[in-house]
């Protein structure tokens, strides 16, 4: 079906140059000058994991075709800096004050990040203080700075058992000068910003203002995007948990749909611009018949045709729809939220109403047709992380603390090809990762969902083959019985 196979690149433009314009110089991580202090973990310093050498991995390990040499040549010339604990560090631990702020929507793993940052700062480095700023960047503003709270080992010990963030969160920018004033007044040397694109762009402004003032401040981002749409990263914290919980919602929709005569289950999942959660939930559950994602815009007529095609072979249909799909169906809501994100039409509600109207229109063909709608978004965002996500949060946070203590600044930490890398904030927020409709994940989705070309014919051909095989078995049995007479 041509309507479902729109071409797309792996990233989309977002506020800056596209990925193919990124240079090696753009990927160079900024570091505060001077490393005159020894890492306090002296008994581990001589081990391999502590190194002052900056190592790299290839941005893309695939070799160029047609290039013949002793060593393969990557299709991308870019290299990414590996994150690691450093033997010599920039900040003197007993004099260092660490700040942590969480911004934007909540996500599984936020408390794990806060906990791991605090425990690494206190246990491994024995820093002077760890300060948590309340309710996002508002907590750094003149009006909100009085709400700052000190974090201790005892105050974060059990917070990883719960969803949300103990520091609170908020959306929207604050005055950069005011925020840097607060950091200077409290003597903060390292600020960890945990949040999405908007948060990290705010962190970039803080880093630039601190640099302009000559402040000895490292600003380090830990990206929070449940949609898994961060460029240069193959996984963000909370995504695995989101897929796991999304599958539970799909199974519930399936149970509802198969219990009805022409039942349709609709599940709306997160994914403003990228449909990774929807696609992975479809593949993992193996119970979705239609998967609608922003990268593959199709019309209402096509969606109804897909449902009709499904009903030709079954009396139930399960649809997964990402929240960013179909924003042109009603002309969009217009405007932006406090974080600068475009306000979205509630496509789950819109789609449900359109399907209900279509079923009423075709009630003679599909008697008792019913739609059940499930939106698990806030339940998913609010739950604690899976064990694997918790481990991932701990690793991200620990390495972030090590690199920040060594003076890395104006950058984020990310996972790429199973390696932890540092990426300058400006580059990391310049492009957004999206589903590749020619890639493996979307191919898997298409293999298990309804299409408009050959699905019914293949189903009917399979039925005919089964009938012919049954007839053949009966024939052979009769021949065998006759031969004994």
Swiss-Prot record:
Gene3D superfamilies: 3.40.50.450
GO cellular component term, pick one: glycosome
Reaction(s) the record says it catalyses: beta-D-fructose 6-phosphate + ATP = beta-D-fructose 1,6-bisphosphate + ADP + H(+)
Residue sites binding Mg(2+) per the record: 197
Taxonomic lineage from the root: Eukaryota, Discoba, Euglenozoa, Kinetoplastea, Metakinetoplastina
Regulation: Allosterically activated by AMP.
Pathway(s) per entry: Carbohydrate degradation; glycolysis; D-glyceraldehyde 3-phosphate and glycerone phosphate from D-glucose: step 3/4
Cofactor: Mg(2+)
Broad class of the protein's primary localization: other
Residues involved in ATP binding: 105, 171-172, 196-199
Protein name per Swiss-Prot or TrEMBL: ATP-dependent 6-phosphofructokinase
Binding site for substrate: 225-227, 270-272, 323, 378-381
Segment forming the signal sequence: none
Gene that this polypeptide is encoded by: pfk
Assembly description: Homotetramer.
Keywords attached to this entry: Allosteric enzyme, ATP-binding, Glycolysis, Glycosome, Kinase, Magnesium, Metal-binding, Nucleotide-binding, Peroxisome, Transferase
Family: Belongs to the phosphofructokinase type A (PFKA) family. PPi-dependent PFK group II subfamily. Atypical ATP-dependent clade 'X' sub-subfamily.
Catalytic residues of the enzyme: 227
A GO molecular-function descriptor: ATP binding
Function: Catalyzes the phosphorylation of D-fructose 6-phosphate to fructose 1,6-bisphosphate by ATP, the first committing step of glycolysis.
Biological process (GO), any one: fructose 6-phosphate metabolic process
Pfam families linked: PFK
Residues marked Important for substrate specificity (site): 198
Cellular localisation: Glycosome
Highest taxon, organism lineage: Eukaryota
Intervals of motif Peroxisomal targeting signal: 483-485
């Amino acid at each position: 079906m041509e309507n479902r196979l729109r071409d797309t690149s792996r990233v989309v433009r977002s506020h800056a140059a596209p990925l193919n314009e990124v240079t090696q110089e753009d990927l160079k991580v900024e570091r505060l000058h001077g490393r005159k202090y020894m890492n306090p973990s002296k008994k581990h310093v001589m081990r391999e994991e502590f190194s002052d050498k900056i190592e790299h991995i290839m941005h893309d390990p695939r070799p160029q075709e047609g290039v013949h040499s002793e060593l393969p040549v990557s299709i991308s010339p870019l290299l990414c800096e590996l994150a690691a604990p450093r033997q010599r560090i920039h900040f003197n631990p007993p004099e260092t004050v660490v700040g942590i702020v969480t911004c934007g929507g909540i996500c599984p793993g936020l408390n794990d990040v806060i906990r791991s940052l605090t425990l690494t700062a206190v246990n491994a480095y024995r820093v002077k203080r760890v300060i948590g700023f309340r309710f996002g960047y508002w907590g750094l503003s003149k009006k909100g700075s009085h709400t700052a709270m000190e974090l201790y080992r005892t105050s974060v010990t059990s917070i990883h058992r719960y969803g949300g963030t103990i520091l609170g969160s908020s959306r929207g920018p604050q005055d950069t000068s005011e925020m840097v004033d607060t950091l200077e007044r409290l003597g903060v040397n390292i600020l960890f910003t945990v949040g999405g694109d908007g948060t990290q762009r705010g962190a970039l402004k803080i880093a630039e203002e601190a640099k302009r003032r000559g402040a000895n401040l490292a600003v380090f981002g830990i990206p929070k995007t449940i949609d898994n749409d961060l460029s240069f990263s193959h996984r963000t914290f909370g995504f695995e948990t989101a897929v796991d919980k999304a599958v539970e919602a799909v199974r519930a929709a399936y149970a509802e749909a198969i219990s009805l005569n022409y039942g349709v289950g609709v599940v709306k999942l997160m994914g403003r611009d990228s449909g990774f959660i929807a696609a992975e939930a479809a593949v993992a559950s193996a119970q979705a018949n239609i998967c609608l994602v922003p990268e593959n815009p199709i019309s209402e007529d096509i969606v109804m045709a897909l449902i009709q095609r499904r009903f030709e072979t079954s009396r139930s249909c399960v649809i997964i729809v990402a929240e960013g799909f179909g924003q042109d169906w009603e002309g969009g809501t217009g405007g932006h939220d406090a974080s600068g994100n475009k306000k979205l039409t509630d496509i789950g509600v819109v789609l449900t109403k359109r399907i209900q109207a279509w079923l009423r229109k075709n009630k003679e063909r599909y008697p008792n047709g019913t739609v059940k709608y499930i939106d698990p978004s806030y339940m998913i965002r609010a739950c604690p992380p899976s064990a694997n996500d918790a481990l991932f949060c701990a690793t991200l946070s620990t390495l972030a603390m090590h690199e920040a203590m060594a003076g890395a600044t104006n950058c984020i930490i990310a996972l790429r090809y199973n390696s932890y890398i540092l990426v300058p904030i400006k580059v990391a927020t310049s492009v957004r990762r999206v589903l590749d409709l020619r890639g493996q994940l979307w191919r898997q989705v298409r293999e298990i969902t309804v299409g408009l070309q050959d699905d019914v014919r293949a189903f009917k051909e399979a039925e005919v083959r089964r009938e012919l095989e049954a007839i053949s078995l009966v024939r052979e049995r009769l021949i065998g019985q006759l031969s004994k007479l």
